[in-house]
UniProtKB/Swiss-Prot annotation:
Record-linked PROSITE patterns: GATASE_TYPE_1
InterPro entries per UniProt: Class_I_gatase-like, GATASE, Imidazole-glycPsynth_HisH
Function as written in the Swiss-Prot or TrEMBL entry: IGPS catalyzes the conversion of PRFAR and glutamine to IGP, AICAR and glutamate. The HisH subunit catalyzes the hydrolysis of glutamine to glutamate and ammonia as part of the synthesis of IGP and AICAR. The resulting ammonia molecule is channeled to the active site of HisF.
Location of the protein in the cell: Cytoplasm
Superkingdom: Bacteria
Record keywords, A-Z: Amino-acid biosynthesis, Cytoplasm, Glutamine amidotransferase, Histidine biosynthesis, Hydrolase, Lyase
Chain's gene name: hisH
Entry GO terms, CC: cytoplasm
Known pathway: Amino-acid biosynthesis; L-histidine biosynthesis; L-histidine from 5-phospho-alpha-D-ribose 1-diphosphate: step 5/9
Subunit field text: Heterodimer of HisH and HisF.
Entry protein name: Imidazole glycerol phosphate synthase subunit HisH
MF terms (GO), sorted A to Z: glutaminase activity; imidazoleglycerol-phosphate synthase activity; lyase activity
A Pfam family: GATase
Organism: Bacillus pumilus (strain SAFR-032)
Transmembrane in keyword set: no
Length: 212
């Protein structure tokens, strides 16, 4: 079963509907005891990095996330949820993140290296390029994904950048180290590629449960 962590800032409806379409058993909850019933977790997120970290601390969910990661359970961050996995963000002043992955979250530039203007936020479809082999990619086509974000991850470990998209800079699109995974785009809104990625995450969670 997949536990969707509800800390008050997630795109819960669209994530839930995507999990239903993927045939997954899931719960959406802010209650730690309820979430403990799950085998793997999704950390969604839309909004401010600082507000999200404050809510995770206030609800006790920050400690719960550290606990399940230490137990080896899969954690998959989506959009802001992915950014929260990193060390810090410059959004609204410097804010510490969960620190599960090395890297910092910074504002996208409004121009590319040739001076061509770019719209911020980065909103719409963009092509994915896979860099590192990962079990998360089994059966996942290297296609287009749907992005909505103004900040991106920089200074991360190159081997933990599993896929990227080009938006004036190389934007880490899928990241991962061990049981900690994330996508900057919205898999639940990303058609064939997004659904394939979610289904593979569910498959990995099922395999992990069976092999306990």
């Amino acid at each position: 079963m997949i536990g969707v962590i509800d800390y008050g800032m997630g795109n819960l409806f669209s994530v839930s509907k995507a999990l239903e379409r993927a045939g997954a058993r899931y719960i959406v909850s802010a209650d730690v005891e309820e979430l403990k019933k799950a085998d793997a977790y999704i950390l969604p997120g839309v909004g401010s990095f600082r507000d999200a970290m404050q809510l995770l601390k206030q609800t006790g969910l920050e400690g719960f996330i550290y606990q399940v990661v230490q137990e080896g359970k899969l954690l998959f961050g989506i959009c802001l949820g992915m950014q929260l996995l990193f060390e810090e963000s410059e959004e609204a002043g410097r804010t510490k993140g969960l620190g599960l992955l090395k890297g910092r979250v910074v504002l996208l530039k409004d121009h590319d290296k040739d001076g061509q203007k770019l719209k911020v936020p980065h909103m719409g479809w963009n092509e994915l390029t896979f860099h590192q082999p990962s079990p998360l990619f089994d059966g996942v086509p290297e296609g287009f994904a749907y992005f909505v974000h103004s900040y991106y991850v920089r200074d991360m470990n190159p081997e933990e950048q599993l896929a990227s998209a080009d938006y004036g800079v190389q934007v880490p699109a899928i990241v991962g180290k061990g049981n900690v995974l994330g996508a900057q785009f919205h898999p639940e809104k990303s058609s064939t590629t997004g659904m394939a990625l979610l289904k593979q995450f569910i498959q990995l969670a099922n395999e992990q449960r069976v092999n306990k």
